[in-house]
Amino acid sequence: THATDATNASRTMLYNINTNQWDKQILKSLKIPSHILPLIKNSSDNFGKTHRSITGKSYPITGVVGDQQAATIGQCCFEKGSVKSTYGTGAFVIMNTGPKKIYSKNRLLTTVCYRLNDKSTYALEGSIFIAGAGVQWARDKMKLIKKASETEKVVKSLKSNSGVYLVPAFVGLGAPYWDSKARGVLSGLTRNTGPKEIIRAIIESTAYQSHDLFEAMKKDGLKPKIIKVDGGMVKNNWFSQFLSDVLNIKVYRSQNEETTALGAAFMAGLQ
């Protein structure tokens, strides 16, 4: 079966979210023949069966959905205005905007959240390039810690950030800035600054970037009341609380760490 769903198709930049088809103009400009592209289906649909040589038995494939969209579904963000944010290497915030597309005036992305019964539910999305990757940098490059799990103990040992801040633009900045030329800045350093202060600045920077994303959403007329979070970074209790404080929003942390797999299972189970 040569097929995909609308959420994955929308990631190719070849998909027209208005017509729910491959964009003819883009394909023509890039000289891509439409017949080589997969059929676009609902997120819950018949995608064929697995081959016995791989899975032992032939099992039906009834759910296909993009990574971040699957996490949104797994977090049960089915209502308009519901938000999930995944904090892994990067961070990805997705807000369900319902059956109507909202085109951001504040540099957020409009995408497909999921598609069922030939009807799309849309979302606004913002991407943070460096979240947990900042902790990896501190561990692997700067040798400030040995394990990522040490960060919670480190930040809790400090009464404040001592005026030390990090702009983690190691690979540019994502939404809402979209500046590929931006580079990282560590400011407020004094002779008293040590590894602990830098670690705290790294952890705090993800919350501050999240604040910028949520402010963009508010300017687009959407004010979330809660945020559902998952990913490796939110295992840090201090970060989860700091995130809530910075955003001034209640943060709900999923007990299920595999929300992406759960969302895909939800889609499969609808068939």
Q: Where do the model's predicted regions map?
A:
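Active-site core segments that coordinate phosphate-bearing ligands/cofactors
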Residues: 1-4, 8, 13-24, 28-29, ...
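Gly/charged, well-structured mid-domain segments that form the phosphate/adenylate-handling core
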Residues: 39-46
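Short acidic capping loops at alpha-helix termini that bridge into adjacent secondary structure
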Residues: 34-36, 225-226
